[in-house]
């Protein structure tokens, strides 16, 4: 635009829509079916429980963006009151959001991961009717998947989470590749490796579940 040219009245609404929806972003291939495949496999194991959340250095557009990709997104956000019955009556692809916009700090600050711990305790109480202590939360295998070493891998590790680097281009060769590691329990995996990397969400879910994508 020229310096003296007026801003078109439709420009701002169009930009707001673009960056509040899938129009302005690109999702990992098979993101939605991968998350649902993970939930399906875990639901078949009566002892296991699965909570999926988002921890992000972003604002309150995130739930809307994820919804526009076809994910079924929970209304649960850090710092926002919620109705427990909403978690009891419906199954979501994404159970909660911890956004720096709400928490007040950004990754790698451990407080944003601590906020996710609080969200986890709320979900356990609402969904499973159990009150959890800090020691109870320690018994959960908390895995964080992100694409930046400094913010995601280091931040998660320092907060007591198990980090998985989403390394699409395969550049972080100093970190063990999950695709090269035989399937085992998460506990054994992170006893042997401080962190691991994976080329895609699809490969991560395949490693975790043994999911056969060719039959889907």
PLM features: what roles do these ranges have?
Residues 1-16:
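A metal-dependent, Asp-based hydrolase signature
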Residues 13-25:
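Surface-exposed cleft-lining segments at the edges of enzyme active sites
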Residues 23-27, 104-107:
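Acidic-and-aromatic substrate-binding clefts and catalytic sites of carbohydrate-active enzymes
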Residues 23-26, 33-44, 49:
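Fungal eukaryote-biased detector of long internal structured cores
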Residues 32, 36, 41, 53-216:
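Asp-based, Mg2+/Mn2+-dependent phosphohydrolase catalytic module
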């Amino acid at each position: 635009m020229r310096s003296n040219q007026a801003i078109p009245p439709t420009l701002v609404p169009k930009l707001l829509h673009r960056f509040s929806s899938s129009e302005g972003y690109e999702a990992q291939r098979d993101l939605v079916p991968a998350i649902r495949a993970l939930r399906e496999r875990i639901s078949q194991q009566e002892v296991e429980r699965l909570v999926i959340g988002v921890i992000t250095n972003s604002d309150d557009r995130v739930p809307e963006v994820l919804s526009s990709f076809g994910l079924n997104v929970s209304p649960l956000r850090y710092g926002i009151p919620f109705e427990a019955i909403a978690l009891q009556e419906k199954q979501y692809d994404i159970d909660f959001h911890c956004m720096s916009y709400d928490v007040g700090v950004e990754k790698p600050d451990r407080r944003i991961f601590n906020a996710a711990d609080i969200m986890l305790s709320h979900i356990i109480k609402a969904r499973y009717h159990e009150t959890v202590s800090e020691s109870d939360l320690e018994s959960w295998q908390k895995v964080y998947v992100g694409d930046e070493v400094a913010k995601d891998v280091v931040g998660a590790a320092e907060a007591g989470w198990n980090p998985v680097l989403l390394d699409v281009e395969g550049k972080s060769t100093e970190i063990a590749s999950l695709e090269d590691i035989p399937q085992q329990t998460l506990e054994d995996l992170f006893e042997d490796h401080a962190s691991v990397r994976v080329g895609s969400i699809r490969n991560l879910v395949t490693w975790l579940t043994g999911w056969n994508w060719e039959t889907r």
